[in-house]
From Swiss-Prot:
Key words of the record: Isomerase, Repeat
EC number: 5.4.99.41
Organism in which the protein naturally occurs: Kalanchoe daigremontiana
Active site: 485
Family of the protein in this entry: Belongs to the terpene cyclase/mutase family.
Purpose of the protein: Oxidosqualene cyclase that generates lupeol, a triterpenoid product. Lupeol is probably required to coat the leaf exterior as a defense compound against pathogens or herbivores.
Catalytic activity field: (S)-2,3-epoxysqualene = lupeol
GO biological process: triterpenoid biosynthetic process
Group of enzyme by EC: isomerase
Signal peptide start and end residues: none
GO cellular component: lipid droplet
Name the UniProt record assigns to this protein: Lupeol synthase
Amino acid sequence: MWKLKIADGGSNPYIFTTNNFVGRQIWEFDPQATDPQQLAKVEAARLDFYHNRYKLKPNSDLLWRMQFLEEKAFTQTIPQVKVEDGEEVSYEAVTAALRRGVHLYSALQASDGHWPAENAGPMFFMPPMVMCLYITGHLNAIFTEEHRSETLRYIYYHQNEDGGWGFHIEGHSTMFGTVLNYICMRLLGEGPEGGQDNAVSRGRKWILDHGGATSIPSWGKTWLSIMGLCDWSGCNPMPPEFWLLPSYLPMHPGKMWCYCRMVYMPMSYLYGKRFTARITPLILQLREEIHIQPYDQIDWKKVRHVCCKEDMYYPHPLLQDLLWDTLYLTTEPLLTRWPLNKLIRKRALQTTMKHIHYEDENSRYITIGCVEKVLCMLACWVEDPNGDYFKKHLARIPDYLWIAEDGMKMQSFGSQHWDTAFSIQALLASNMAEEIGITLAKGHDFIKKSQVKDNPSGDFKGMYRHISKGAWTFSDQDHGWQVSDCTAEGLKCCLLFSMMQPEVVGESMAPESLYNSVNVLLSLQSQNGGLPAWEPAGAPEWLELLNPTEFFENIVIEHEYVECTSSAVQALVLFKKLYPLHRRKEVERFITNGAKYLEDIQMPDGSWYGNWGVCFTYGAWFALEGLSAAGKTYNNCAAVRKGVDFLLNIQLEDGGWGESYQSCPDKKYVPLEDNRSNLVQTSWALMGLIYAGQADRDPTPLHRAAQLLINSQLEDGDFPQQEITGVFQRNCMLHYAAYRNIFPLWALAEYRRQIQLHSEATKMV
C-alpha cells in the first residue's frame, strides 16, 4: 500500500535542505502494509472514480486522507445538520456545520503543520518525466512496478471518450496531450494494442485521425526531437545565444517571465546541442505508429509552423513566424558551422548551463516547476551522465509525484504553503481556538519555518533574480522562489497569530522577519499599482508577440494580477494597524495605489478576471476583499457596487454560484452546464459579498448561500469534490484538492462571525 511521508529526507546523500525538509511530502510504497480493510477501501475508491470518470474529472484525493484519519482514529461525533427550505439559517446550525468541518480538517493536518493536497491536473506533466528517465537509462531504477501501474492508471482513467487526452483533465482531446500520453504508455511497457479499455490503439487512432504527430504544438515538437521521433529541423529555433545578448536589450531572457525563462533555458541548451536520444527498437516502432507517412519521407521544414486545430489557443502573429524563419534560414546555419560553432555556440551553451546549475542549486534541485525540472535534469545528464548535478536531480523526483484514487501523476510542484495559509485563515475565522489550539500552533510553526530566510546566492541580480529574503513560496522553503500573494498570505497569518495568546498558538514571528516580508511586497508593486506574482513587471508589452507556445497566453513577460494585488493590500493594511510607524508613507502609498489598480482593472460588467482560479467569481472575491481592506465600501466606491451587482446577478436558484472553466480561455463569464452550483465558487462569492457589506442591504442572498453550503456537507464533515477550480496562463486548469474543504469552511466561518453574530446582536437590541 502507498503511504504519504512528511518532512522526510531519507538517506540519499545527494539531497539537501534549508529547514530540515519541513513541508516535504513524498509517497512510498510499503509492501508490508496489507491490511485487508484498508486495501478494500482504496480499491473501492479507485473503482468509484473509474465508473464516474466522465462525469467528474478531478479526484477526491482520498488515499492520504484515509491514511491520516486511520492513523489518528478520527470519528465524527457531531451530528449532521440540514436547513429546510423556508427555514431560517440559525446560529446553532451554522456553528454545528462549521465545527464538524473544522474537526475533520484539523485531523487532516500533517505532523509538520501543513495540509497535504494534490496540485495537478495538466496531462502533459508526467510524460516528459518518463521520457527523461527512459533516455537516461534510469526508468527501471526510479519507477518501480508499483509506480508504473499507478502512472498507467492515471493515463487510463483520464482518457477521453474519443480516445484522446486533453491539455488538462477536464479538457477536450489535443494532439499534445494525446501524443505525450501515448508515448508514455509505450515507454512504460504497453504494447501497440495494450492498455485498459484498448487505451493504446484508441489513442493512436485519435492521433492518426487528426493528422499525425507532426501537427503537435511547438513544445511537443521539442520533446519528440529529443526522443528521436521528430527531426530538430522540424522545430523553430531556440538559440542559446540569446543568453549572450547585452542585458539591456528588451529581448534578453532576463526580461522574460521567470517560468518562460526557466523553460527556454534548458530547451535552448538541448536545441543548441541538437541532442537526440539513442534510437532504440521501441523508438523506431513509435516512428511508425504516430506519423501518417514514413518517417524518412517527412518534410520537416514544412511542419515547423503546423499545429493541430484542437491545440490552437494562441495563434502566432505573422511577425513571430517571420522572426523564426529568419533565424532558421540565416542565423542557425551559421552558428552550427565552423568557426562560429566554436566561437559563439560553445560559449552560449556554457553560459546556459551556468544558469541551469545556479537555478538548480538555489531551489535544492526542485527547480521552479515540473516542466522546468525535467528539462534541467536532462540537460545536466547530457552535460555529464555520471555527474553529481544529475544525481541531485534524481533525488528530488519524489517531491513531484502524487497518488490518489485516479493513480500517480506529477504535481506542478506542490501547494503546501498556499493551502496552509488559506487553511489557517479559515480556521482562525471560525473562532474555535479553544478547541483546535494544537492545530493552530502547528500551522503557525509551519508558516514561520517556511519563510525564505535569504536571497538567492551570490550575485543574484547578475543571474536575473529578484530578492527573496522574507518571502514565502508556493510550496516550501527549499523551493526558494518568492511569490507575492504567497508572501502576503503568509504575512497575514503571522500578523493574525501575533494578536493571539502565545501559550495557545506559539511565539509570534520576530518583527524583523515581518519587515523582510513587507520589503519584498513593496519591491514588487508596479507603477500602475498592481502586483506581479514573482518578479517586478516592466518589460515592454510587445514582447508578448513572441509567445512561442500555441496553448498559453501572456507567458513571455511578467504581468500584474488582481489576486496578488488584493492579497498584498490586505496584508499591508493589517501590518499598518499593528506596526504603524514602519515605512509608513511607503505602505500607505502602496495601499492607495493597489486599491486604485483594483478599481481600474474592473470589467465593464462589474467583474474581475481571475488569473489563478475559475474565474470571474474568484477575481470578484479577491477584488472586493482587497477594496474593503483599503476602506472602499458600497457607498463610497462605484467598483464595489458594480462588483456586488455582478455577483448578485449570477447567483443561482439554489443560492449558489457555478462557473465553467471555459470562462478562463474565453475571457467572458460562462456558467456551469445545467446551471449547477459549485461549493468552492459559492464560498468565494459569499465571502466577497460579506466583505462588500451585503448584510447591511439585504442578507437574503447570504443566507441562501450559507444554506447550500450547510446542506451540501457530507456525513463525516467533508464536502464533495466538484469541478476543477484552479487555472494558470488562462488555458490550463489546475486541481487544488484542498479547496473543497478550505473555502466552504472559511465562508461559513465568515458568515457565522460577521452575519449571524451581527444578527443575534440586532435581535438582542
